[in-house]
């Protein structure tokens, strides 16, 4: 058995490098002058735990103290839930200057909540996504996002499965990390 983005004991797992993904997003926000960075993450899974670790680790390395209120639990691919979390963040006395969403689709909920509040992206608040789906390239303003390399995830999983079938006695269960890349857009303002 080969799994993608799920870890099971004694099973081959091909994983998107979620720690590196959040590090890239936080560093991009920081390089653009943001110090009040919020993160709406997905429900608690191994993927989420890695993303949270990447977020907190990078913030600590950069000397950023992130208030607990800036880290919110949303639901992956649920734009409405992420819109509600965005409204909460916007209601804070000292709101964040940048919000990282759990995925690009959920960021649409953030776009809507920000517009409903009479604010503009990126003039009033910056927004980042995760996944790098086609939608992130066509939404206005174009979303800054971390693109997972889904082609390499699939190819690596297929290669490992073939290896397991052809050489079952010498194939060891391992975890293989596949890195993605930061896609620039126009949703983050330099402050």
Model feature map: region roles:
Residues 1-191:
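Bacterial carbohydrate/catabolite-sensing allosteric modules
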């Amino acid at each position: 058995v080969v799994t993608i983005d799920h870890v099971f004991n004694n099973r081959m797992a091909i994983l998107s490098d979620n720690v590196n993904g959040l590090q890239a997003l936080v560093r991009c926000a920081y390089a653009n002058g943001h110090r009040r960075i919020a993160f709406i993450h997905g429900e608690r899974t191994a993927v989420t735990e890695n993303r949270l670790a990447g977020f907190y680790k990078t913030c600590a390395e950069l000397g950023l103290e992130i208030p607990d209120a800036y880290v919110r639990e949303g639901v992956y691919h649920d734009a409405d839930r992420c819109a509600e979390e965005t409204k909460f963040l916007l209601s804070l006395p000292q709101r964040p200057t940048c919000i990282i969403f759990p995925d690009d689709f959920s960021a649409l909920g953030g776009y809507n909540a920000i517009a409903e509040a009479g604010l503009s992206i990126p003039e009033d608040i910056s927004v980042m996504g995760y996944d790098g789906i086609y939608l992130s390239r066509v939404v206005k303003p174009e979303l800054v996002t971390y693109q997972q390399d889904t082609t390499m995830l699939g190819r690596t999983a297929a290669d490992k499965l073939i290896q397991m079938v052809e050489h079952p006695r010498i194939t060891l269960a391992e975890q293989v990390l596949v890195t993605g890349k930061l896609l620039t857009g126009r949703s983050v303002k330099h402050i």
